[in-house]
Amino acid sequence: MTRFSTIVEKLQHRLFKSVVSNNLVYNSCWEDPRVDRELLELSSDSKVVMLTSAGCNALDYLLDDPEVIHCVDSNPAQNALLELKVALFNNSNYQLLWDFFGKGKKTGAEIVYYRKLRKFLASEARSFWDQRISYFSPNTSLPSFYFRGTSGKFALMIHNRIMKKGLYPQILKLLNADNLSQQAYYFEEIEPKIWNNFQKWLIRQHVTMAMLGVPATQRRMIEDRYKGGLLHFIRSSLKHVFTELPLKDNYFWRVYITGAYTPGCCPNYLANEYFHQLQRRVSKINTHTRTLLEFLKRNPGKYSHFILLDHQDWLADKQPKLLAEEWKHILHNAAKGCRILFRSAGNLLEHLPDFVFQHLEFREDKTAKLHQIDRVGTYESTHLAIVK
């Protein structure tokens, strides 16, 4: 590698770190909890350690009534988001929860926050939302919370492109299609009209990927596997999701495109039928603003589940020593039979420390089929490892 290339990579890493450190990056989770719960097999004695992201999936896992869920994230913004969701459950008003996170907007959000929600938040989350509760106040240019945060800004750009091209009615027909044939028809009509030269250029830029929470390591993994690079990967992933999987319950892409959920297409934590059940269980969630390694050093124990999202990708290339140390602590704190779930933009297993494979059994027989029906569809692989 040339000295110039090394400098460029360092600048890219610094850019990514500056974007994701304290900004709200993920306003919703991008891992399918329906797949997760089938793989995890949670029960009443489960002690879960997971990365927070937007907190949607932690709430979903509560439906299986685990003993405790430790949500760990080095970004305080992500934990603040989960704490606000928990506050809405503690406030005992389903309609308010739906307004904030189902519709993504609430008239008078600031008044509601100070009168009803702020008292439920820890000091760090209070500081965050004191300055940003207006994210839920609708306006013409930013009509939804789901167009806020760094990933939300890119979603807004796609949304505006759809509106400008007059494609929104067709998009709704696509999302509400009755069968795969209808989905394929509308997708083939719409897809070429979304991607102009500017969008194609933008998707190749490192700053765009940083806004979406995609580090340079993941980008390289994708480009190594796909001849057409990142753009080809994105377009082929979208084609799979929009033409080969039913969209009627695909709330991930509905909220990304429209900025809102519907009662029939939303995460479980927003479904009215689960509100009181989750309200009784949200006290089982604990948030920790630190790295996973720091959490394990401060909170040793025998945990039954680790949910690592795509975090391993972030360390694999640039911080192999840190990756190895993290795995040593995971294995040291894992109970026998512990289930470890993670995803990757490539074939991450080849990047894991050698000693890991002595202690784990990878269940590709379980993950291969479920990965194909994952409603998000933007990861190259899903991995479930069971501690021997």
Spans of features found by a protein language model:
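Conserved class I S-adenosyl-L-methionine
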Residues: S44-S53, I69-C71
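N-terminal, Lys/Arg-enriched amphipathic/low-complexity engagement segments
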Residues: T2-E38
